[in-house]
Each structure stands twice: as structure tokens, then as C-alpha cells.
């Protein structure tokens, strides 16, 4: 069982400090500047092929054209408990995916064996399981024309808050929680709450277990 993803006692993040570090790091590169791009190597030759930046607004418009009729569009989504300014480049679901990927709750999954250990096999943890689920789910979502970023966010976050030792931990922890312990509900409502994720992402995480109501998005259905 995980505590919230970030402690309130953790030091505040200074964007200016990160920018300064990025500039200092770029100056250690042996490359050169060309059309506003810093190349890492002195003999770099391959750029992006274009200096045109595809921002979030244009990418959301492409989603509207390319995704399947019932797929979840990023435009108009992004309903968070605490309202936030939209990112210039990333969609709301890409931001969710990134937050989960960098969260301490996600990294702690590495210390939890999924079920039990086979001495002759590699250990499978909740972290490796989440990565495998994300790989399969995004492949399916891409083939079906669904929102891949939302699918990946749900898949990566679906076991955050899970107890150790498989689902037996739910039985062990349930007596201590009035409504009983369900790792999916606990993950969405407690462990990941500090990340301020979108409602669609939390719904997919909360309802990925078959004992729960069906998710409200096709992306959530793919993960479950």
C-alpha cells in the first residue's frame, strides 16, 4: 500500500533552477548551435528535419481527425480537481503519463513482487508488470485508433497503491479500512491524488479491476 505520491514536506520545485541547470548542461556539450538547435556532438549531422514546432493545439486537432469515433479526445478533457494552465506542447493525458512515470509511488512498485517467486525464473515485480501492461495496452489502443497517451497513463498507474504479495494483501489490509481495501480505489483516491490527474485517467485506474464498474472510456476498457 502506497502513501500519496509526494509528501507535503518535500522541497518546492524552482523552475528557474531547472532552467539554469539545463543551460549549464548544454554548455558541456561538444557540439554547435544551428538554427536555434544545440547539437550534442561536434560531428552531429542529423537534425529533426524541420524547425517547425507542432504544439498541443495542432496535435489535438490531429487527434480529432485521426482517432476512432469513440476514442477519448484530449481537447475538452483535462478535468482536474485543481484547475491548471494547459501545457504548450503536451496534451493533458501526456502530462498525466509523465507525472505517473516520475512519481515515487510508481518507482516503489519495483520493491513489490507481483505474486510469488519462482527460484528458476526472473523476479517479476509490480513495476515490470505495469510496464508490460502499458506495452500491450498501447499496442492495442494504437491499432484501434484510441488515445494512446490516456491508455498509457492508466496502464502505468493502475497498480500504484497495490500492497505486497499479490491480491492477498487486500484481504490482509481490509480489516483496517472501513470500506475495505481495494488497491484500484486506493490508488486513484489516495496514492495518486497529489498528482492532480485528469478525471478520465483516475476513472481508468479506479475501475480497471473486473470487480469494479466498467471504465467510462474505451482506453480504460483496453487496460482492464
Question: Language model features by range: what are they?
Answer:
Residues 103-119, 144-150, 155-170:
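A short glycine/small-residue-enriched secondary-structure motif
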Residues 94-95, 144-157, 200-205, 223-224:
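Alpha-helical scaffolds flanking conserved acidic
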Residues 82-88, 92-102, 106-128, 212:
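Active-site flanking loop/helix segments enriched in acidic
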Residues 129, 158, 183:
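Histidine-centered divalent metal-coordination motifs
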Residues 20, 25-40, 58-84, 103-107, ...:
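Sequence-structural signature of the catalytic-core scaffold of metal-dependent phosphohydrolases
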Residues 1-36, 47, 51-53:
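N-terminal secretory targeting signals
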Residues 92, 132, 186:
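Charged catalytic carboxylate motif
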Residues 119-150:
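Alpha-helical phosphate/pyrophosphate-handling elements in metalloenzyme active cores
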Amino acid at each position: 500500500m502506497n502513501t500519496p505520491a509526494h509528501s507535503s514536506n518535500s522541497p518546492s520545485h524552482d523552475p528557474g533552477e531547472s532552467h539554469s541547470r539545463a543551460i549549464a548542461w548544454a554548455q558541456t556539450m561538444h557540439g554547435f548551435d544551428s538554427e536555434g538547435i544545440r547539437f550534442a556532438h561536434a560531428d552531429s549531422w542529423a537534425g529533426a528535419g524541420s524547425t517547425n514546432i507542432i504544439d498541443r493545439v495542432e496535435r489535438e486537432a490531429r487527434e480529432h481527425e485521426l482517432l476512432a469515433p469513440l476514442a477519448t479526445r484530449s481537447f475538452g478533457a483535462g478535468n482536474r480537481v485543481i484547475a491548471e494552465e494547459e501545457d504548450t506542447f503536451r496534451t493533458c493525458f501526456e502530462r498525466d503519463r509523465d507525472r505517473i512515470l516520475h512519481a515515487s509511488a510508481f518507482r516503489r512498485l519495483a520493491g513489490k513482487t507481483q505474486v510469488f517467486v519462482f527460484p528458476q525464473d526472473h523476479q517479476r515485480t509490480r513495476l515490470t508488470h505495469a510496464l508490460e501492461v502499458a506495452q500491450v495496452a498501447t499496442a492495442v489502443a494504437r491499432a484501434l485508433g484510441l488515445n494512446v497517451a490516456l491508455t498509457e497513463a492508466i496502464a502505468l498507474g493502475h497498480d500504484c497503491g497495490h500492497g505486497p504479495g499479490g491480491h492477498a494483501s487486500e484481504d490482509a489490509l481490509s480489516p483496517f479500512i472501513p470500506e475495505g481495501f481495494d488497491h484500484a480505489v486506493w490508488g486513484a483516491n489516495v496514492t495518486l491524488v497529489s498528482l492532480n490527474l485528469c478525471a478520465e485517467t483516475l476513472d481508468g485506474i479506479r475501475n480497471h479491476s473486473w470487480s469494479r464498474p466498467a471504465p467510462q472510456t474505451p482506453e480504460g476498457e483496453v487496460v482492464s
